[in-house]
Regions:
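Terminal, regulation- and interaction-focused segments at domain boundaries
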Residues: 2-18
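Polyanion-binding surface elements
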Residues: 13-31
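Glycine-/small-residue-rich active-site loops that bind phosphorylated ligands and cofactors
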Residues: 15, 50, 61-62
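Short, electropositive, low-hydrophobicity segments enriched in small/polar residues
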Residues: 17, 43, 64
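A short, structured beta-strand/loop element
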Residues: 28-56
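C-terminal structural segments of small proteins and small subunits
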Residues: 58-84
């Protein structure tokens, strides 16, 4: 699924059964980079934002509350999807 399509799906509130790899691709599309992995925690940072994004993969999916946290962060800092 394209980044734009996934973002539209999430914005409509469809937060269940989101593939971890697809969501990581979306997070990276907003300019975040993987800083480190500690166990199941994947920590992403953005060069212009001090707050970090913590994602956990559970059975190949991302936790819905972490999707909500990320969407709030994008809105708070008015970050735009890069490229595609």
């Amino acid at each position: 699924m394209s980044r734009k399509k996934l973002l539209q799906k999430l914005a409509q509130g469809h937060l269940q059964n989101v593939a971890f790899g697809e969501f990581v691709n979306l997070v990276e599309g907003f300019g975040f980079k993987l800083l480190r992995t500690s166990g199941s925690h994947h920590i992403f940072g953005h060069p212009e934002i001090l707050e970090l994004v913590n994602l956990q993969e559970v059975e190949g999916q991302v936790k819905p509350y972490q999707i909500r946290q990320f969407l709030r962060l994008v809105e708070k800092y008015n970050i735009n999807l890069e490229g595609k």
